[in-house]
Amino acid sequence: MASELCKTISVARLEKHKNLFLNYRNLHHFPLELLKDEGLQYLERLYMKRNSLTSLPENLAQKLPNLVELYLHSNNIVVVPEAIGSLVKLQCLDLSDNALEIVCPEIGRLRALRHLRLANNQLQFLPPEVGDLKELQTLDISTNRLLTLPERLHMCLSLQYLTVDRNRLWYVPRHLCQLPSLNELSMAGNRLAFLPLDLGRSRELQYVYVDNNIHLKGLPSYLYNKVIGCSGCGAPIQVSEVKLLSFSSGQRTVFLPAEVKAIGTEHDHVLPLQELAMRGLYHTYHSLLKDLNFLSPISLPRSLLELLHCPLGHCHRCSEPMFTIVYPKLFPLRETPMAGLHQWKTTVSFVAYCCSTQCLQTFDLLS
């Protein structure tokens, strides 16, 4: 087997192959033949799935500098080394079905990376530097142990497909609603109890799957007329069992994001002072300066400055930004034309988040 492997690599070196297939070779170590002398300078695609590799060499980028695709699916790799960041031409990296516990921050240096697959590992967090991957189109981090997603993920402006199924997420950063190219978002089998108010506001986002998040009872009304999966959501549970802000209408109850400070009703006549001030600041700086960076960080607490950059949400009726208070209105999915598509497998409601009593009274999901 060793001689056959050496022969395969030698032929690839002599004939300057661009593709090399080393799948199913029972390899426990990265082949030294690949790293000899100058390495394989012409190699662009390396396939090494279903081996028993536990690590990657530190000089990988030096010996294989022109790698465009690296497939290491189904090995036993525990750590993505710092050296991976030197593969500056890499566009596809597949480390699915390994034993990954750590992804090094240097992965953010892979500025050409378009597809990153890290499914079926043991990751508890992703480094913030993932947000530096401006060309990233596909990110699959399903079946890990993630509790949160890095907020800088919203800086991946080319991201189209994000899959985070079967993790331990209990919330989704509202900043992800700013992803301009996101077309499909799958978060099935997590611990979500609420979704960002603006999820679905982007016209690019067409597919959202949140199946089997049993505490999830409300979907932002922006998701109406999108392709959604929500089977197994909205299981009966006592509100007191979940320490989250909730809103009830009739026999329906939904949980709201922790950033919501107050829930308005149709009987309110005046907005809270902080909400009025934030809306005024927002419109002033957007209309006069066109750039919130002109606002000195010293003038406002960091939390409020962040809200100005990324509001809690936008009114589902008039698109007015909201910062502290929302006026919710429920539309049970079973009472909409979409009921037949879900075959009664869910008890969730669409939630319209409005900015005022006027918008609350005039909003109609079905009109």
Swiss-Prot record:
It comes from the Eukaryota. GO terms for biological process: intracellular signal transduction. Signal peptide: none annotated. Pfam families: LRR_14, LRR_8. Keywords: Leucine-rich repeat, Repeat. The gene is LRRC28. The lineage of its organism: Eukaryota, Metazoa, Chordata, Craniata, Vertebrata. InterPro entries: Leu-rich_rpt (IPR001611), Leu-rich_rpt_typical-subtyp (IPR003591), LRR_dom_sf (IPR032675), LRR_domain-containing (IPR050216), LRR_R13L4/SHOC2-like (IPR055414). LRR repeats lie at residues 16-36, 42-63, 66-87, 89-110, 112-133, 135-156, 158-180, 181-202, 204-226. This is Leucine-rich repeat-containing protein 28.
